[in-house]
Amino acid sequence: MGSQWLQGSIRHRRLYPVRHEFEYHTGMLALDTDEWNEVTNISPFFSLERFNWVSLKRKDYFRPEAGALSDAVREQVKEATGWRPDGAVELITHPRYAGYVFNPVSFYFCYRHGENGNNGDVPAVIMAQITNTPWNDRHVYCLETTGSEANSAGWRTEQFAFTKRFHVSPFNTMAQHYEWTFSFRGPELRIHMNVVEEGKKHFDATLVVHRGPLTRN
């Protein structure tokens, strides 16, 4: 099975106008979207399209009316970049827990043929699906990577800066822009996101996780 489990921590920091931060342990699913119909077979407590302790529902993700998630993402990436992913499409997300889901952002890592996250490969395109609260609207950003070389510590880093095009939170204005950094080293993944307005960082979030096998344990 190509799907994996990510274990680590996430930190949120609001830096302006009042400083506040928190950090907590987290686990996330790294789902090979071509395994959508099989991944829940690992446990009787993991279900597809029905209530369970852990579950996946197609309506929680990109264009549920379009059929298979993997095909919908590939077509969107082709429309945005001109390249249709010919390798794995890996969804980084929180599944539903006891029927409840909260994913401010889910990432679709789109790999070249023969590459995948299990090997620490850098995706050719990262598609981010933003879901706002409390309106539950969605927007996607397609980010093309550059094929960066590893630094002396073995990290391969991709950086993006772009204008905010979607209202996410009543606490953040549309005058802001994003600075995102993705770092890859073998089974390790780091994602850092800055929210900047008028040259001042208002908020950041950092995800640090390690890949492991997806098992019933």
Task: Give the residues covered by each predicted segment.
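Mature, function-bearing regions of proteins
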Residues: M1-N217
